Amino acid sequence: MPLYVIDKPLTLHILTQLRDKNTDQINFRKNLVRLGRILGYEIANTLDYEIVEVETPLGARTKGIDITDLNNIVIINILRAAVPLVEGLLKAFPKARQGVIGASRVEVDGKEVPKDMDVYIYYKKIPNIRAKVDNVIIADPMIATASTMLKVLEEVVRASPKRIYIVSIISSEYGANKILSKYPFIYLFTVTIDPELNNKGYILPGLGDAGDRAFG
């Protein structure tokens, strides 16, 4: 399964600041932007490229790489927590077209939230996805039960893009397995895999509610 855990010293340093309850709102958002940019560069390493030849100012010719798929990127922002993450991704993919999806979990009465939650999409604005051409990147900082992501994937998979990437900061073991079991062709990029979900569907140890911490 194409699971990429980008657990390098720098990404883990930034993740530690995100987890810290004392990190303020401004720095929380800035750190999401930083990780979005780093994860974007990691994704770029998996895109299709061509070997090209260029001439330097000294008149010498040398071979290099042209990542052709940099022109074929669609980034989908799952509101609202993904906004800073997408800001970082756009620094890595400045030519990307953007889409937005608003999704919400159906509230459940009771103390315990089921892992298979109903999700409804209340807003959707996605650019045309060119079949077998575009690489779609779906951004959501936290993949807990994966219910929201699976709902969004239903929309994206129908368009038959060339590749589908998911970018998250923290994925639960349950959520990652659920996504990749259903869609084994998807590329999931995350900084870490956390082992648990609590009875409200939050990741443990996690970092709290990313949307609330980023925007209040």
From Swiss-Prot:
Disulfide bonds: none annotated. Keywords: Allosteric enzyme, Glycosyltransferase, GTP-binding, Magnesium, Nucleotide-binding, Transferase. Binds 1 Mg(2+) ion per subunit. The magnesium is bound as Mg-PRPP. 5-phospho-alpha-D-ribose 1-diphosphate binds at R80, R105, D140, P141, M142, I143, A144, T145, A146, S147, T148, D209. Allosterically activated by GTP. GO terms for molecular function: GTP binding; magnesium ion binding; uracil phosphoribosyltransferase activity. This is Uracil phosphoribosyltransferase. It comes from Saccharolobus islandicus (strain M.16.4 / Kamchatka #3).
